[in-house]
Each structure stands twice: as structure tokens, then as C-alpha cells.
Amino acid sequence: MLRPWLRQCPRATRSLACPQCHLPRPQTARRALRPLPALSLSHPIRSLQTTTTESPDRIPLRKQLKQDAKAVKARKRQTRENEEASREKWELTVGIEIHAQLNTESKLFSRASTSSTDLPNSNVALFDLAFPGSQPEFQIATLLPALRAALALNCEIQPVSKFDRKHYFYQDQPAGYQITQYYEPFAKNGYVDLFRHDGIAPEDGDTVRIGIKQVQMEQDTAKSQEYPPSTQLLDFNRVSHPLVEIITMPQIHTPATAAACVRKIQSILQSCNAVTTGMELGGLRADVNVSIRQRGDTAGTHQYGGIGGLGQRTEIKNLSSFKAVEDAIIAEKNRQIAVLESGGVVEGETRGWTIGSTETRKLRGKEGEVDYRYMPDPDLPPLYIGADLVAALRTNLPTSSDALIELLAGPEYGLPIEDAKPLVELEDGARLEYYQEVVDLLRALQSDQDPKAQKGLARVAGNWVLXELGGLWAKAEEAWDAARVPAPTLAALIDQLQRKHITGPTAKQVLAMVFAGDERPIPQLLEEENLLLRPLSREEYVTLAEAAISLNPAMVEQIRQKNQLGKLGWFVGQMMRMGEKGRVEAPRADAILRELILDQR
């Protein structure tokens, strides 16, 4: 049955049309159809696009990637040029304040524990919460790690020091003031030396000495945790935890050197057992003071740490990583330069930094001495430090990292700085002790060998301790344990390698077996596993070399005619593949190849 709208059309001109869009669909007719009325442009017409013509502005992917890479390189080059121009015109000055938690069992002015693993608000004394009538009791034991830190930083210990109150109101400080040593700290006039291997900026040369203005003891504040929109939780376990505040002189002029300074000071504090943790676990925080002035301009009105002619400084608080120190200084330097170049004035203020940001943000106006209302603490007597105590602590200080690196890089060990530095820093010196034991044992085992060969044993041992054994530890993702591969075992393995009883690949295989738990002595393990090297005769080497040469005559001609000696390594590899595993020695294979290829030109 025809639909009503179709019945109204004559048969000859009937067409199927969509009732929604009313577009006719012509059917076959026996007589000519009348012309259809023009279609309204208001109705969409669908058509199939079959052309493959590309848009004229379309760029092939590979070309686009190249253009993007060039643009990035150009931006970096422009940034470097701008920074270079900025360095020539403007001088950056940075001073650092480092707050480090001391390694003590009790708090600074109470007997409450400093444990960081207990439940929140479980280690709190009445004085920590500023209960009325509670009095501070200075804990003598907290002074010892503070003194070790100051001595390691080459400071002068003051025979008499005093405590002061620094007044401010904030929720993490129940008393309304912090006890510190502003006027008479216990240590002054120290320094820290930074070297190129510490990561200082190239423009700072090979070494930089940064002065330490003072080191003072003070209280830590409560730990706060924010729950938006309006809730904050406070853990008072941290209140009155002993801190040392280390204040450097404003003698740093590059962001990289500032980060290197914080890193070096943390390393020094850890090496003398003055602190429990570093920046990575929140045990050390840094504030940086940043100022800008035109290079060569000494007419500035601001003075910090006895150095005058500086620009107005801003302070960036609570930086918790070395990268944050460097990035925050760069951002603040650029901000101050932009302000000055636009004719503005840099305001003295406290600013904050968020990891991953490119700009610092204002927190509050900068407080001065008057704002904090420093005053002597009437409840604490002066602190007297005896010269005998200082002398005893100085005698028992561990060797500094700089001295250890100098020793390892010197004639006794001959290590490159790149190996000496991690040996000193890894596992708080445990890796260094292990390495020195391996070297001593190896030298004893090799005492019957050529003195010239013995001279390089320390470097060989360094490579095995850092690279080969270190690689196994990194792959296992486990904490260092010297008993896993005892020093005598590693020394015996290297001895077998030096005597050419085994090849390098075999030595690595055996080390992996020992690391996995094989406790057999090295000689027994090599014998039972049939891993001892059975040297090939000259005739066997020649046979292997001739077989390898026959594989690629064209490369042989390149070596002979163009002296491309680097391609000999390919033939050495072929000989090692064709020969019995572990028996082909690369140096001997190379020598035979040179005879057959070069001497027969």
C-alpha cells in the first residue's frame, strides 16, 4: 500500500523521497520526466570525496619533527645568549640558611623522644606545648652532634654562647616564639670548599670557598598537614627537635654552585654523624636569600653578613631538594632582573617555590630584626663549652670527604675523580672500606708479579667494585651488604683474571654466580665448572683468523688500503664467536689479525 504522501503524485513522476528532508530519489520512468524544481540550498547534499589532493599547508611528519627540533635548539640558543648577556650586566648574589635535624635521642629542651616513627603527638612534653609554668631543660647530649657539625665545617667554637627568643605567631609554634642563638651562636667563621667535581658552575672555576657566618642551635616547629578547604592537622612530635642552622656568607653567584653548596654541606653533616637524614627524607631544609645588582656596582644600600653594596634581597623558604634550590634561584633571579629592567624596585619579601613551577610566589613581607623582637631567653643560662671537649671531638672526627677523594685520586690508588667520588659517598663510606680491603688483599696476592702490573691494581679493583659488582646490586635493587661477595672472594677473582687464568667474560660470570649465593672458593669453583682458560696455540689463532678474514674480504681491503684499523674489532669478534667459549683472548687475536692483514699488504 502506498503511503498517503506518495498517492498524490502522478505515476510518471513519482519518486521516492525521504519524508524528513524531502529530497527526491528518481525512479525509472517510461516517459520523460519533467524537470525537477531547484533544490533549496538550506538542505545538505552528501557526496563522496575521492580526490587525494593534500592540503597545501600540510607538512610530512619527518619534516615537521626536524623543524620542531630546530625550533627547540634555537630557543635554547637564544636562552643561553640571553643568560650570557644577563650575566654580563647583572650579578647574582646568594646566601643560604640550612636547617638540619640533629642525630639525638631527646629534644633540645625536654626529655621527650625524637623518634619519627611513633604515633603523632605521642612524644610531647609539657614544655613542648608551652604549658604555663613549664621550663626548658637544655639536654647536654644534643650539643655533641652540633659540635661535630661545626668542627666539620671548619668553624671556631665559642667558649660562651647564649639562647634568644625569636617572636612570631603561627600555629606550629605553641609558645609564640622560637628559641635560637641569634646574638651569640656557639660557632662562627667557618667555610666549605667546593670543587669542580662537586658540581659548581664552570664560570666559578676549579674551586670556590664559601664562608660560614655562624652555626646556631634552635628548636624545630610542629609538623602540619593541610586538608582543604579549612582543616590543618598538627603533629607536635617535631616541636623542639634539635636543629642546627648553618648560615653561609652571601658569596655565591651562580645557581648551580648554590645547589652544590647545599649538597656538600649535607654530605659533610652525614659523614660526621651529626644528622639522621638528608633532604630526601625531610631532615634538611634550605632557605635561600637572593639579590641582584648591576655588575661592578658597589653603590647598593643593602648589607648582609658584613658584605655591603648589595641589592635588595628576597628569601625563598623551605626548599626540600637540590634541584629546587637551583631552579628557585634561577626563577627569582629572572624575576628580579625583569623588575629592575622595567624600572621597578625589588621589594624585600619572603617568597615560596613549588616544584615544577617557573616562578616564585609572594608569601609575605620580609620581617626584620625588629619584627621578630629578638631578646635573651631569661629561662636559659649561658652555655659554656670547654676546650678539652672541643679537642676530643676534633680528634675523633672522621676524615673529610675532600681528603678521601684526594687520597683516592693520588698516587697510592690513582683513581679518576669520577670513581673516587662515588666510592666516598656510597653507603656512608661502607663501599670505600670494602674497596680498600679488596685492594689490600689483591696487592698481597699479586706480590710475586711485576711491580709495573701491581701499580694498576687499585684502578682494576675500583672498576670491579663500582661497575661490575655495583651493577649487580643495582639490578637486584637491594641494600648494600659486603658479606654478599666477601672482599677476599672478589680479590681472589681479580687475581685469577690478572694472572690470565680466566678471561674477562668468565670473571663476570663467576662474580654473578657468587652474588647469587655460590659459596665455593674461587679456585674450586673455576676448576669444577671447567672455567679455567686453556690458552690457544699460535697455529689455532692463525686458523681462526684466516677463517674470520675469509668472511669479509672487502673489509680486509678497506683496512689495508685506507688504514681503517677500527674495523679489526669486527674480525676479533668473529674469532671469539668461532672459537671455544672463553679461550680466545682479544689482545692475542688482534695481534694475529694485524700480522695477517697489515704485514701482507
UniProtKB/Swiss-Prot annotation:
One GO cellular component, as annotated: glutamyl-tRNA(Gln) amidotransferase complex
Pfam families listed in its UniProt record: GatB_N, GatB_Yqey
Claim: Mitochondrion is one of the keywords in the record: yes
Organelle targeting sequence: 1-55
Tagged with keyword Endoplasmic reticulum: no
GO molecular function: ATP binding; glutaminyl-tRNA synthase (glutamine-hydrolyzing) activity
Catalytic activity: L-glutamyl-tRNA(Gln) + L-glutamine + ATP + H2O = L-glutaminyl-tRNA(Gln) + L-glutamate + ADP + phosphate + H(+)
Quaternary structure and interacting proteins, as annotated: Subunit of the heterotrimeric GatCAB amidotransferase (AdT) complex, composed of A, B and C subunits.
Role description: Allows the formation of correctly charged Gln-tRNA(Gln) through the transamidation of misacylated Glu-tRNA(Gln) in the mitochondria. The reaction takes place in the presence of glutamine and ATP through an activated gamma-phospho-Glu-tRNA(Gln).
UniProt protein name: Glutamyl-tRNA(Gln) amidotransferase subunit B, mitochondrial
Native source species: Aspergillus niger (strain ATCC MYA-4892 / CBS 513.88 / FGSC A1513)
Lineage: Eukaryota, Fungi, Dikarya, Ascomycota, Pezizomycotina
